[in-house]
Amino acid sequence: MTYLSSNQLKQYEDQGYISPIEVLSSSEALEARKEIELIEKKMPSEIDNAGRYNVHLISPKLDSIVHNSKILDAVESIIGKNILVCSTTLFIKNPNEQGFVSYHQDAKYIGLEPHNWVTAWVALTDSNENNGCMKMWPKSHLNIRDHNEKFNKGNLLTRGQTVENVPEDKVKSIELKAGQMSLHHPRIVHGLSLIHI
């Protein structure tokens, strides 16, 4: 069992996220990536821009990540034993493409209340400043913020939901190695930096 430590739980409560958490081996992460590439070739419509949701439903290999005991134990540490996977999303960074995810709060547009759920983000490749890692605004999970819908080219969010005036000097880069995970509160302001490949 891989339950979170008291220090990790305190970080989640105080900061709104925990990172990094080891959940997959490098070979498991590579196998998942190969599976996604296979789906892209054999069933491209299942994984295009509009179809990057719930791909675990068509792939036993990806479904095994959803049911990974290390992930579930960490999530259980935060929300308890009643765990429901509401959805999964793939953020795919293809070579020679630029993209980003604007700063937003999951709670604002997912519509699940109360906000006693958690988002698990599992890296299948290394995610760092050079290739576009997640960014979190610590302590921003204490309240819901206004969002604007901006349909900017390259934004990987379908509605372009954006929190304005995020203080970049307070934002933390969440660099992950393939197989590591971050957990974040549904109200934390977060995004994905511009991807330069």
Annotate each PLM feature:
Residues M1-L112, N148-E149:
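Non-heme Fe(II)-dependent double-stranded beta-helix
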Residues S102-Q105, V122, R159, P167:
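Active-site glycine-rich loop that binds ribose-phosphate moieties when present
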Residues S25-S26, F91-K93, K108, S127-E129, ...:
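Short, solvent-exposed loop/turn segments at secondary-structure junctions
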Residues I83, Q98, H115-W117, E129, ...:
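Coil-to-beta-strand transition motifs
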Residues I195-I197:
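Conserved small/polar residues in nucleotide/adenosyl-binding loops
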Residues E129-S193:
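Double-stranded beta-helix
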